[in-house]
Each structure stands twice: as structure tokens, then as C-alpha cells.
């Protein structure tokens, strides 16, 4: 894979069960129907009630330049995030869909569930905690329109970076990124980014395990010929709520790396036997 490469990721559904609830038919000014979305923004949520209003506000502003829809995938948040999302969907200035799942089933499977409800041909994945700037959405979309299959908001290319992280978290991130790149033979600089855009058909095909909280690395590992663009951005640590990252998520990520590595070795062996 080369930088600015493009690709073809394919997916299963490790989707958790969920019931999508769309907002009433959205209309623009003067009562005109809104244009069909060209970009679907999938946002997994769990206890993000405090962040949600600012997220919707930021996406509404971005939707002035780009026809967006927002798909919230809520894992039965005890703080009422899903209920608040339903209420906001009734008057949101952009199309808004809320998918309710019965419990925590992981961020990766939430993204797959959201992609299944998307109406546009391009899906963007971002956090609900305001760490991912909505103003970068046009650049990600333009990269896909320009021929990329995957467009990554990258912390580890020139002009990218991370703000407000303690040294220990920076170290963990770098070690995990290096493990993914070296272990799976990935050439992109930030295969663990949680902020990326991808062609919808890539996420709705079968085959993904949907384990843990990092779906992008599985996309890249399964589709080494993917055409990928990396767009620099600075990750600003979340300003609302608490981090989703847990020891369980880290363990799921390590299991995923091992599973993907074994899968690549098996594919290589099968290829050699056929020669």
C-alpha cells in the first residue's frame, strides 16, 4: 500500500442489533425538502449526553457547505444519550437517524451498524466527544471524490499532531500504531485513527469481525491495495465526558491484531500452495 493510495475494504457485519429511528423528513429553508445527503456521519455513543448538543451544532454548521446526515448509534447509554438524540432529531437542521442497541457491543460493530443505515455513498466515522473537528469533513469527502477509497484524518503526517495528551498516552499510542504498521505490513502513518471516511460499499460488504474499537486497521489489513489519502489534523483531547478506552478495548485490539496477522499468513500459505 502506498500513501495517497486508494482501496477496497470489505465488511461483515459484526453489527449489533439495533433499531434505526430517523428524524421526520428534514426540510430546508422555505419548506423545501433537503437535498439527499452526499456524506453520512456515523457517531457511536455511550454516555455522551453532555457532548451531543455541541456535536450536532458543529455538524449542522458543516452541513451548510456539504449535504450531511448524522447517524447516532447508541449502546443503551445509562445517561440518556439515546433519548436526547431522539429529541434533538425532531428539530435538528440536518437529517438525523438514531439507532438503539440493547447494550455495549463495541465501537467497531457500532460503525458497521451505522453504515448499514447510511443513505449516501460515503461514510465518515468520528467520535462524539468533540475530539474530531467537523470542519475537516469537506477535505475527507473531497479526497474520496478525488479517487481515494479511504481518507484518513491523520495525526502522524506532517502538520498533524496530538494536543493535551500526557506522555504515557502518547507512548501507548505510538507503540500500538507501530505494532499495527509493522505487524500487518501497513504503510499508512496513522492506521489507528478513529476519524476517517470510506466508500459505503466497503463497510456494507461481508467479512469484518468488528472487534474492539479500531475498525480502520481491519479495513486496511483486509484490503492492502486500498487507495488511501491521509489528511493532516491535530487531535485535541476530548473536552466533554470521559474516555471510552478501557483495558477491555485494548485487549480486543490486541486480539484483532493477532487474528488479522494469522489471516494474512494463511492467505500467504494458500497462495504459495497454489503456485
Listing of model-derived features with the role each one plays in the protein:
Residues 69, 83-117:
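Conserved donor nucleotide-binding strand/loop of the catalytic core
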Residues 38-40, 69:
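Cell-envelope/extracellular polymer assembly enzymes that use nucleotide-activated donors
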Residues 50-54, 79-88:
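Acidic helix N-cap motif at the loop->helix transition within catalytic regions
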Residues 74-83, 103, 130:
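A conserved acidic beta->alpha catalytic loop
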Residues 1-10, 15-36, 181-186, 208-275:
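Hydrophobic helical membrane-anchoring modules
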Residues 57-67:
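Short, acidic, metal-binding catalytic loop of nucleotide-sugar glycosyltransferases
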Residues 101-117, 122, 134-213, 238-248, ...:
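Acceptor/aglycone-binding surface of glycosyltransferases and processive sugar-polymer synthases
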